[in-house]
């Protein structure tokens, strides 16, 4: 895939990632990858004032969320099915920037992220490599959070253990201005586009998961399936629809 490559600093590790995911320089691309001293960032060449995007599992936001964790306040704990010493294996079939996958792993679950877009996969891999080396979280992140680069619709063909839980957070259109995400995330959505195969992805997930499929939706959106939703957990802005496997 072609994208504008800007080298602010030479980094051998990141250069290997560019080669691994076959990312080539395109002078005319409106999106760019910034190679920093120790991180890979996606940025908008048409708006240099817009904050670049990178995967950072050691961010202040993640640190705060983990440090202030309370079972009743963490919705991913409530929907995951964690009980006592039971920590389900989770397959995040719509990894994105890995935010929710990281929280599942922090909670004690072994998590596999699947991402098909090569640029997003490169950002995730960069974030994982840096996270694995972190003194505070690296020791458990290495054993709990991993990435598979593939199409989630082909998950039945991937030689992986059958997960207890499959988590879906598909892209959805926004119908009014108040529901728009931050500008940097709007830019990220331009890169990966909307998921028009979300319903099919749910069907495939229900054939693979052992215990449950969790679908994250905006509060105003219709369920992905016409089948019965077995359980619903709501927050201020989102709804988590839980389905049983076939």
UniProtKB/Swiss-Prot annotation:
Keywords: Cytoplasm, Methyltransferase, rRNA processing, S-adenosyl-L-methionine, Transferase. InterPro entries: 16SrRNA_methylTrfase_J, SAM-dependent_MTases_sf. It catalyses: guanosine(1516) in 16S rRNA + S-adenosyl-L-methionine = N(2)-methylguanosine(1516) in 16S rRNA + S-adenosyl-L-homocysteine + H(+). It is found in: Cytoplasm. One of its GO terms (molecular function) is rRNA (guanine-N2-)-methyltransferase activity. It comes from the Bacteria. Its EC number is 2.1.1.242. Disulfide bonds: none annotated. S-adenosyl-L-methionine binds at residues 115-116, 169. It is an enzyme of class 2 (transferase). GO terms for cellular component: cytoplasm. Belongs to the methyltransferase superfamily. RsmJ family. Specifically methylates the guanosine in position 1516 of 16S rRNA. This is Ribosomal RNA small subunit methyltransferase J. The gene is rsmJ.
């Amino acid at each position: 895939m072609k994208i504008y490559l800007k080298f602010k600093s030479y980094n051998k590790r990141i250069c290997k990632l560019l080669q691994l995911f076959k990312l080539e320089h395109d002078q005319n691309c409106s999106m760019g990858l910034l190679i920093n001293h120790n991180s890979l960032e996606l940025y908008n060449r048409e708006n240099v004032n817009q904050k670049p995007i990178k995967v950072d599992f050691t961010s202040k936001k993640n640190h705060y969320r983990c440090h202030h964790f309370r079972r009743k306040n963490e919705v991913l704990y409530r929907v995951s099915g964690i009980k006592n010493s039971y920590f389900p294996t989770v397959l995040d079939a719509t990894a994105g920037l890995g935010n929710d996958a990281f929280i599942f792993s922090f909670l004690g679950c072994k998590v596999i992220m699947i991402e098909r877009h090569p640029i997003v996969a490169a950002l995730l891999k960069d974030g994982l490599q840096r996270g694995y080396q972190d003194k505070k979280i690296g020791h458990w992140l290495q054993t709990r959070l991993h990435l598979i680069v593939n199409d989630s619709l082909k998950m039945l063909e991937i030689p992986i253990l059958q997960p207890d839980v499959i988590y879906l957070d598909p892209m959805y259109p926004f119908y009014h201005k108040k529901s728009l995400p931050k500008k940097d995330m709007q830019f990220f959505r331009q890169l990966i586009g909307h998921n028009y195969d979300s319903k099919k992805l749910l069907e495939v997930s229900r054939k693979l998961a052992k215990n449950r499929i969790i679908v994250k939706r905006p509060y105003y959106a219709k369920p992905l399936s016409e089948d019965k939703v077995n359980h619903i957990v709501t927050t201020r802005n989102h709804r988590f629809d839980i389905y049983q496997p076939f």
